[in-house]
Amino acid sequence: MAVEGGMKCVKFLLYVLLLAFCACAVGLIAVGVGAQLVLRQTIVQGATPGSLLPVVIIAVGAFLFLVAFVGCCGACKENYCLMVTFAIFLSLIMLVEVAVAIAGYVFRDKVMSEFNKDFRQQMQNYPKNNHTVSIVDRMQEDFKCCGAANYTDWGSIPLMSKARVPDSCCVNVTQGCGISFKVKEIHEEGCVEKIGGWLRSNVLVVAAAALGIAFVEVLGIIFACCLVKSIRSGYEVM
């Protein structure tokens, strides 16, 4: 028995949402990978809220893509089991995204404190490790900052002369510009406030995006349930 306009419209909107979910899934994976690459150069990798968040985002994105595919198959074939599975898994993803959003908000200051701790540790290793030198120099050049709190932090590094800072602190970076420097020729602001603040704000953006996607997924769940009810009633929505 064919269903008139209303259910056909629901099925069409569900297809549109499934395409949107696929796009969101790809976006989440891209954001997660990008965040992971950034965090590799800013905070110590380990089981911390800051470093685990990108992994969760990537996993949610991959799972959302798979669930969207299941939903598409279920809608095309009007398969009751597939649509129920789609609705259940989409509900789980929505709950995870809400949890990610809450975690991002709760741990926003934790990300900044982790960065502060790690940046100071990297400063201690700066003269001894070429990889650390590369990471710290890139951060100081890109964010136009110097030291943790400010440029004077470099004076407390054992293997650094008190009369110099890394060349990456200079406004105009040239070899040896950090030796016997003049304050007006270097960036005085510390990196913790600049980079940590940038990380904190981006965590909040990701949290807000997760809530936005979760809201759209609620619509997907509603439409899926409507289609499930129609299929269970023995209707055929062409």
From Swiss-Prot:
Keyword Membrane appears in the UniProt entry: yes
Keyword set, alphabetical order: Cell membrane, Endosome, Glycoprotein, Lipoprotein, Lysosome, Membrane, Palmitate, Protein transport, Secreted, Transmembrane, Transmembrane helix, Transport
Gene3D superfamilies for the chain: Tetraspanin
Keyword Membrane in annotation: yes
Cytoplasmic-side positions: 1-11, 73-81, 224-238
CDD domains: CD63_LEL (cd03166)
Pfam families assigned to the protein according to its UniProt record, in alphabetical order: Tetraspanin
GO cellular component: cell surface; extracellular region; late endosome membrane; lysosomal membrane; melanosome; multivesicular body membrane; multivesicular body, internal vesicle; plasma membrane
Compartments where located: Cell membrane; Lysosome membrane; Late endosome membrane; Endosome, Multivesicular body
Residues bearing attached sugar chains per UniProt: N130, N150, N172
Locus of motif Lysosomal targeting motif: 234-238
GO biological process: cell migration; cell-matrix adhesion; endosome to melanosome transport; pigment granule maturation; positive regulation of integrin-mediated signaling pathway; positive regulation of receptor internalization; protein transport; regulation of vascular endothelial growth factor signaling pathway
Membrane topology: Multi-pass membrane protein
Record field: transmembrane: 12-32, 52-72, 82-102, 203-223
PTM text: Palmitoylated at a low, basal level in unstimulated platelets. The level of palmitoylation increases when platelets are activated by thrombin (in vitro).
Residues on Extracellular side: 33-51, 103-202
Record function comment: Functions as a cell surface receptor for TIMP1 and plays a role in the activation of cellular signaling cascades. Plays a role in the activation of ITGB1 and integrin signaling, leading to the activation of AKT, FAK/PTK2 and MAP kinases. Promotes cell survival, reorganization of the actin cytoskeleton, cell adhesion, spreading and migration, via its role in the activation of AKT and FAK/PTK2. Plays a role in VEGFA signaling via its role in regulating the internalization of KDR/VEGFR2.
Subunit description: Interacts with TIMP1 and ITGB1 and recruits TIMP1 to ITGB1. Interacts with CD9. Identified in a complex with CD9 and ITGB3. Interacts with PMEL. Interacts with KDR/VEGFR2; identified in a complex with ITGB1 and KDR/VEGFR2 and is required to recruit KDR to ITGB1 complexes. Interacts with SYT7.
Family: Belongs to the tetraspanin (TM4SF) family.
Protein name per the record: CD63 antigen
Lineage: Eukaryota, Metazoa, Chordata, Craniata, Vertebrata
